Amino acid sequence: MSMVYFNIFMAFTVSFVGLLMYRSHLMSSLLCLEGMMLSLFVMMSMTILNNHFTLASMAPIILLVFAACEAALGLSLLVMVSNTYGTDYVQNLNLLQC
């Protein structure tokens, strides 16, 4: 494994660990998800370019489309929660609490 792939994999791992550790705030969870998507995009693009997979060249663009949709939905949820409750705690999203 080259050093570039290792660094991108470490970026994904750090984002994933950040998602697990800082899951109490919605904004930090969204930032960690975006970091994971960015590292996946770079890893997928580099793999496709290095291995000359011409049939899979659309996959990184499709991943970016899904990441943009995820970001838009996450930010709209963040705005709704912060307007309703005044904070961005994820525990406010639990519908089973009274």
Curated annotation (Swiss-Prot):
The source's domain of life comes to Eukaryota
Q: Which organism is it from?
A: Arctocephalus townsendi
Compartments (UniProt record): Mitochondrion inner membrane
* GO biological process terms, semicolon-separated: ATP synthesis coupled electron transport
User: Which family is it part of?
Assistant: Belongs to the complex I subunit 4L family.
Q: What is its main location?
A: mitochondrion
Note the subunit structure.
Core subunit of respiratory chain NADH dehydrogenase (Complex I) which is composed of 45 different subunits.
What gene is this protein a product of?
MT-ND4L
Functional summary from the UniProt entry? Core subunit of the mitochondrial membrane respiratory chain NADH dehydrogenase (Complex I) which catalyzes electron transfer from NADH through the respiratory chain, using ubiquinone as an electron acceptor. Part of the enzyme membrane arm which is embedded in the lipid bilayer and involved in proton translocation.
State the protein's name: NADH-ubiquinone oxidoreductase chain 4L
Q: What is its EC number?
A: 7.1.1.2
